[in-house]
């Protein structure tokens, strides 16, 4: 991933990577590998935004309102795990993760576990 990309290009790649991950076919080894790479790419992109575009955090946080391909969930995790954030942004990101944790799909359990670990670390 090139570090000299514009903020807009990075966010576009982030959203495309979320789509790739969302569309994983777990019966297809190549699809899983591609999806895992997309997840790694999103983490790298979040790190690049944090490093090179820290003034764009508010703009990045608007992804918390985009549930398409679970972009909101990815952004919430990356804001809390990688970026510097305000208490209000922390609350917004946590509410996104809590919403997914309350569902009855395969991502809910992972998000419930993540929230438990997060809360334990915050004590």
Tell me what each language-model feature is:
Residues 35, 39-42, 72-73, 108:
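Residue-level detector of extended alpha-helical repeat arrays and alpha-solenoid scaffolds
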Residues 67-68, 103-105:
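Short inter-helical turns and helix N-cap capping residues of alpha-solenoid HEAT/ARM repeat scaffolds
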Residues 11, 53-63, 87-98, 123:
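Amphipathic alpha-helical scaffolding segments comprising HEAT/armadillo-like alpha-solenoid repeats
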Residues 3-40:
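Short terminal alpha-helical segments
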Residues 61-90:
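Mid-chain, well-packed structural core segment of small domains
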Residues 15, 46, 61-64, 77, ...:
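Amphipathic alpha-helical repeat scaffolds
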Residues 12, 77-78, 113, 117:
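Residue-level signature of alpha-solenoid helical repeat scaffolds
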Residues 48-52, 82, 118-121:
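Residue-level signature of the C-terminal ends
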């Amino acid at each position: 991933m090139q570090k000299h990309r514009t903020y807009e290009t990075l966010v576009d790649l982030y959203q495309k990577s979320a789509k790739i991950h969302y569309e994983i076919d777990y019966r297809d080894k190549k699809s899983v590998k591609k999806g895992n790479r997309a997840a790694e790419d999103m983490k790298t992109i979040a790190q690049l935004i944090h490093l090179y575009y820290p003034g764009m955090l508010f703009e990045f946080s608007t992804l918390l309102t985009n549930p398409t391909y679970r972009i909101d969930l990815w952004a919430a995790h990356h804001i809390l795990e990688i970026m510097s954030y305000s208490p209000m942004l922390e609350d917004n990101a946590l509410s996104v993760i809590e919403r997914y944790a309350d569902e009855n799909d395969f991502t809910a359990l992972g998000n419930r576990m993540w929230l438990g670990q997060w809360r334990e670390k915050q004590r």
